[in-house]
């Protein structure tokens, strides 16, 4: 059940009462992201390319913060995890062994008038048919005819058929079938084919995991909802190797870990719902999967998952490659193929959820002004602190502001210097990009070494001694 995303808060600031809400539409987020340099349409100069987006300076900073937090939490701070960065291009036999060349398909229909293609399950869901992806191709075709469903342009639709979503490409100068490979549709296979390499290099005890964050490519028929469903995206993924008899224990462990992660990046646990995927909808490699879905304004959608992949991948790669991928327990001398728990975190989707969660609008009770701000956690915010000279045409103020800026830059890294426009406009600009604190250097600073520190969420301004500034910003 989707709950209301509306939240009302109030706080006193400069004698004005702010009335705020986090009820954000997709249109508002898209507008803010482009205006403030988070995310731009891909190839916009040439009319764009559907399903592609470019991350601007603030967007890539936000994405890197999330990625670094994830890596620290699941690799650096653990003693049972090994990081990898496998190639995007892989031998095509990898995808044959994994099953992707046969079953990595989506159901599609054609507009019989224009030739435009659409995801059949999406059209059915848009017309009130729930869990359409669990239906067979024939069931989808029958429902489209029975319900009289048309294309978005109002034209008749073809029968439903499958479409393989992998991007094929050629390797080298040869134009032959054996030169064909694919842009990877998932990061997982790069970890499975390196399982033996890591075991031979590090001799880890079970359970242990491999971690990877990287780009994936899927030829989506109907990219939609901004960066939620795109043709190029980043996934942060773990493959956790366990004994078969222990899979349920570690499945629950990683199930709980998702909520710890969500809290760390600032998501409201009440807006995250678990979907225990029905058996008929499971991926070909999975025996059990739980999707973690977040309440976006356009619906409750998946942003992560935990799957029990059994020994499907290692067993199939062992069979197709002819290489023994079993594991030798050095304590018991047992040899067996480990089973796998796979926690998956969609980086772009997690970022999208953080943007939606953080968006606030506030109107001043005593004026018609509206304030928009992003209530990022400090660890997530692309800019940690902004430093202002009160006036840009006063060299003494600018010099002192530069001195404070340099000091904070060494401590936090993500610090900006801003002297463009009046102080109110600078505050609003930093609010919209989610900067937690602004530090203003004024004439009093020159006399007593104090500065004004403004809090983003409350708008409250405090006078702070420079020697206590780090503590005030923590």
Residue ranges and their predicted role:
Residues 1-20:
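N-terminal amphipathic/basic-hydrophobic helices that include classical n-h-c signal peptides
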């Amino acid at each position: 059940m989707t709950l209301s995303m509306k939240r009302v808060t109030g706080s006193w600031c400069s004698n004005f009462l702010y009335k705020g809400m986090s009820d954000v539409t997709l249109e508002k987020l898209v507008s803010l992201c482009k205006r403030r340099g988070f995310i731009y349409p891909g190839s916009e100069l040439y009319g764009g390319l559907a399903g592609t987006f470019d991350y601007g300076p603030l967007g890539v900073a936000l994405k890197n913060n999330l990625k670094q937090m994830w890596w620290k939490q699941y690799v650096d701070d653990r003693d049972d995890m090994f990081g990898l960065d496998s190639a995007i291009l892989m031998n095509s036999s990898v995808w044959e062994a994994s099953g992707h060349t046969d079953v990595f398909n989506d159901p599609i229909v054609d507009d019989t008038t224009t030739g435009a293609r659409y995801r059949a399950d999406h059209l059915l869901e848009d017309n009130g048919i729930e869990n359409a992806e669990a239906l067979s191709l024939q069931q989808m075709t029958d429902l489209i005819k029975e319900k009289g469903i048309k294309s978005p342009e109002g034209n008749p639709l073809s029968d439903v058929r499958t479409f393989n979503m992998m991007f094929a490409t050629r390797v080298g100068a040869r134009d032959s079938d054996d030169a064909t490979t694919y842009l990877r549709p998932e990061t997982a296979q790069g970890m499975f084919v390196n399982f033996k390499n890591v075991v031979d290099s590090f001799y880890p005890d079970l359970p242990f995991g491999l971690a990877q964050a990287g780009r994936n490519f899927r030829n989506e028929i109907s990219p939609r909802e901004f960066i939620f469903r795109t043709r190029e995206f980043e996934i942060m993924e773990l493959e956790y190797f366990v004994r078969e008899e222990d899979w349920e224990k570690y499945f629950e462990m990683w199930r709980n870990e998702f909520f710890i992660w969500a809290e760390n990046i600032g998501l409201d646990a009440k807006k995250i719902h678990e979907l225990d995927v029905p058996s008929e909808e499971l991926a070909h490699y999975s025996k059990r999967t739980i999707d973690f879905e977040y309440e976006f304004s356009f619906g409750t959608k998946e942003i992560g998952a935990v799957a029990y992949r059994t020994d499907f991948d290692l067993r199939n790669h062992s069979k197709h490659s002819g290489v023994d991928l079993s594991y030798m327990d050095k304590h018991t001398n047992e040899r067996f193929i480990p089973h796998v728990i796979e926690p998956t975190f969609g980086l772009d989707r997690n970022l999208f959820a953080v943007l939606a969660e953080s968006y606030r609008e506030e109107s001043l009770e005593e004026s018609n002004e509206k304030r928009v701000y992003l209530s990022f956690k400090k660890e997530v915010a692309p800019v940690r602190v902004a430093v202002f000279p009160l006036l840009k045409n006063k060299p003494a103020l600018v010099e002192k502001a530069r001195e404070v800026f340099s000091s904070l830059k060494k401590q936090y890294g993500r610090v900006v210097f801003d002297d463009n426009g009046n102080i109110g406009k600078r505050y609003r600009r930093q609010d919209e990009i989610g900067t937690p604190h602004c530090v203003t250097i004024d004439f009093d600073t020159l006399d007593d070494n104090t500065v004004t520190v403004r809090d983003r969420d409350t708008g409250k301004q405090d006078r702070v001694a420079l020697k206590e500034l780090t503590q005030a910003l923590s």
